[in-house]
Amino acid sequence: MSNIKRYNIFILLSTLARNIVEVFSSVLLYKMGYSLKEILLFYSLVYLTGAITSTIVIYLTKILKPKYILIVSSIIFSGSFYYMSIMDKTFTNLIIFSIIYGLGAYTYHTIRHYYAIKSINNHERKEIGSILIYTNIAIVLSSVIGTYVETKLSKLILAIIVIIISVLAVIPIFKYEDRTNNNKIKIDKIEKNKLLFFICEQAKVINLSLQPL
């Protein structure tokens, strides 16, 4: 099996698991009794944790292969959702969940793009667009599965499903032929217009997440 096929399977399954969490977190927190202000604080802490994590993770690739970072990320992320499924409604638990969630989410989002671009053979790069197809399929499936399980079953069952899918997602990565050069890492300054676009885009994501409330 080629790298791109392994990576697409990883993207399909990992996006399916993660999107269940990303789509339903605000709804589940609201159902637990958290206010809109507390949910906005949750997102603020997630992005703050993400900003720090994204920078550190790139330098971690000098020490660890990206696939191992992705595997650890999957463990942290699925663990964060399990924690939310069993936690009591307290301010401290919300802070802890926000930090764990941010660590797992931004370790994943940072490395998966870096990993695809740096690791895939030149002759396979023309197929990278297929990643978007698998991502969109997973987004649709996650909405359907998440809605059904959350309404018919429980948060704990939903968390267990996320953990199982996350474990299955990392299996193809074990056999991924890693061609990254860990000694060459370049951090470029983000242009102001791109930074503004990113901020507006994330504000849109938060707004969409809060719409069901």
Please provide the spans of the model-predicted regions.
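Residue-level signature of mid-helix packing/kink "hotspots" within the transmembrane helices
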Residues: 47-55, 139-140
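Hydrophobic core of transmembrane alpha-helices in multi-pass small-molecule transporters
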Residues: 12, 91-108, 202
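Helix-loop boundary and gating motifs at the non-cytosolic
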Residues: 1-48, 194-213
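Helix-to-loop junctions at the C-terminal end of transmembrane segments
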Residues: 53-66, 150
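Small-residue (Gly/Pro/Ala) motifs that create kinks and tight helix-helix packing interfaces
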Residues: 26, 138-150
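Structural signature of the two symmetry-related core transmembrane helices
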Residues: 68-83, 163
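Symmetry-related core transmembrane helices of the 12-TM Major Facilitator Superfamily/SLC fold
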Residues: 157-174
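Intracellular juxtamembrane helix-capping segments at the cytosolic ends
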Residues: 106-120
